[in-house]
Amino acid sequence: MRKEYLVSHIEENAHQADIYSLNVVAGNLWSASGDSKIKKWSIGDAEHSLVEEIDTPHKLGVHHLATSLDENVVVSCGFGQDVYVWNPETNEFRDLGNNAQHPSECWSSCISPDGQTIAFTSVDGRIAVWDNPSDCKISELDTKGKFGLCIDYSPNGRFIVSGHQTGQLFLISTETGRLFHVLSGHTSPVRSVAFSPGSTLLAAAGDSKMITIYDVLSGDQVGQLRGHAAWIFAVAFNPVGDLLLSADVEGKIKIWDIDTMECISTQSETDGAIWAVAWYKNGFIVAGADKSIRWYRAAATE
């Protein structure tokens, strides 16, 4: 069954460079860009006005934001492999690069649901898990030089998954700190991974132009979503877990019904790459190479 979405607001030139990450935090949308800024936008008002602009210490730009499920911790990763942990209420931050034990050349990060641990991928293939309050390393897995492009924490806190340049996916048990599954299905870079809200399913996508759905416990593939004609850089489940949002480098945005594994909506308001997507209460939000933020709502939503 098809579902219609409408563009409800476009914030043109929201940043001065590509927008690489979007996260909903404490009632606001956070956007991060190659211009080294993080901006907060109102979710509540129709104009989605700018709430606050933060000049970050990321001198080469910001490409990843991660938020804990309780929304009390935000981690930002920059192109200089610098990592900062933020208090979203006060905007106070600390530089994890000052920790001599911290892995160098960090690329992406994710945070446990309670905000107590942070996991990182790195350009040299390591996956490191750190205690957030103390900044002490809990565990580290070496994937033998395979660039970790993306990472996610399961909402139940039991698993971490990382996607790599080689197409490999590593599912790690947080209880043991060891590999739980090595997931097959991709032979080209995996650029985005996402757990379902119930932590039962995992979506992975990238240069293969398809989205693979896995059963988390068994590691089995349960679906392949085909329809994109270009590299996919972002996937995200909606809060209920019945829909999956995906976006590619040619500006195509798709919504998938997880029960039927079928595409129910396609949007294409820009030809530029979409680097980031996020859900909010009335629909979803996308941003990318054209420096704009687009807000969509379901056609039946007032």
Curated annotation (Swiss-Prot):
The keyword Nuclease does not apply. It comes from the Eukaryota. This is Meiotic recombination protein rec14. Component of the DSB catalytic core (DSBC) complex, composed of at least rec12, rec6 and rec14. The complex interacts with mde2. Gene3D superfamilies: YVTN repeat-like/Quinoprotein amine dehydrogenase (2.130.10.10). WD repeats lie at residues 14-51, 57-96, 101-140, 142-184, 185-226, 227-266, 269-302. PROSITE patterns: WD_REPEATS_2 (PS50082), WD_REPEATS_REGION (PS50294). Keywords: Meiosis, Repeat, WD repeat. Required for formation of the rec12-mediated double-strand breaks (DSBs) that initiate meiotic recombination. GO terms for cellular component: cytosol; nucleus; Ski complex. It holds the Pfam family WD40. One of its GO terms (biological process) is nuclear-transcribed mRNA catabolic process, 3'-5' exonucleolytic nonsense-mediated decay. The keyword Cell division does not apply. InterPro entries: SKI8, WD40/YVTN_repeat-like_dom_sf, WD40_repeat_dom_sf, WD40_rpt.
